[in-house]
Amino acid sequence: MKVTLIIPMYNESSIINEAIDTFYGYMKEHFGDWELIFVDDGSVDGCGKAVEAKSADDSRVRLISYTPNMGKGCAVRTGMLASTGDIVIFTDCDNAYGTDVIEKMVKQFEESDFDVILGSRNISADGYDGYTFIRKLASKTYLKVLSIAAGFKYSDSQCGFKGYRGEAARRIFRNCEVNRFAFDLEATMIAQRLGYKIGEIGVKVINHRESKVNVLRDTPKMLADVRRMKKNVKNKTLV
C-alpha cells in the first residue's frame, strides 16, 4: 500500500529545512512505499529550493510549484491530483499535529471502510492543549457555526489534517474549485454527495502558530461562502 503525504507551503523558508527532515525521516522509517509532495503555492522566499535539493537525492520527494499565490485550497488540490498513493494525507508544513498521527490515520484506513478521514481537535480531551481559553472558545464556536451552516455532523471541518483513499481523493478534488480556506468544506460536501463514507480521528495541536483566521472578521464571509458552496455543490455536475 502506497502512502502519499502532501505538504502545502507558502513562504516557509524559516521552517522548511526542519519540515523536510521531519517528514522525510518519518515516511522513510514507517512506510515501505511512499511519496512526499511539497506544493509551493507561489512563495517568494525561495523555500522550494530546499525541496528541490532533497528531490535530487531521493525522487520520492517531489516539488510542485506555481505562481502566483492561489491559496491553500489550490495547493492541496494540486497535490491531490498529482498523487499516486493508495492513501493520500495532507498536513501543515509546521507539523502542527505531529507525525505520529500519520501512521495512526493509515492504520484506521486499513482497519475500516472509510473513504475519507477528517482530523478533529474536538474528539480528544487534549485536542486544544496549549490554546488560551479565549482562542479555544472562539475556535469551537466558529467550527460549530460552520458545521450547522454546512449541515455537517462532523466536529472539526477546518482541521489541517485529513486523509483520503487515493481513488476518492483524486475524484473529490477533480470536482473542487475553492482555492482558499473554505476548500475543506467544499471537499467534504463533494465527498458526501459522491456517497463516500467519512470518519474522524482525534488529533492534538502540538505546534502553535498564530491563526490566520480572525473569527470576528472572517465568520460572516465564511458563512456566505458556505451558503454559496452548498448551492454550487448541489447543482454541480460531478465527474
Language-model features, listed with the residues they occupy:
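Short, well-formed alpha-helical segments that are part of the catalytic scaffolds
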Residues: E12-M27
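A conserved acidic beta->alpha catalytic loop
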Residues: D40-K49, N95
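Donor nucleotide-sugar binding loop of glycosyltransferases
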Residues: E12-I15, S43, K72, G98
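Acceptor/aglycone-binding surface of glycosyltransferases and processive sugar-polymer synthases
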Residues: Y66-A82, T99-F181, H208-A224, T237
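Catalytic donor-sugar/metal-binding loop of nucleotide-sugar-dependent glycosyltransferases
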Residues: K153, V178-N179, T188-I206
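Cell-envelope/extracellular polymer assembly enzymes that use nucleotide-activated donors
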Residues: K2-T4, E35, E186
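Conserved donor nucleotide-binding strand/loop of the catalytic core
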Residues: W34-I37, G48-A82
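Short aromatic/hydrophobic "clamp" motif used to bind/position activated sugar donors
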Residues: V88
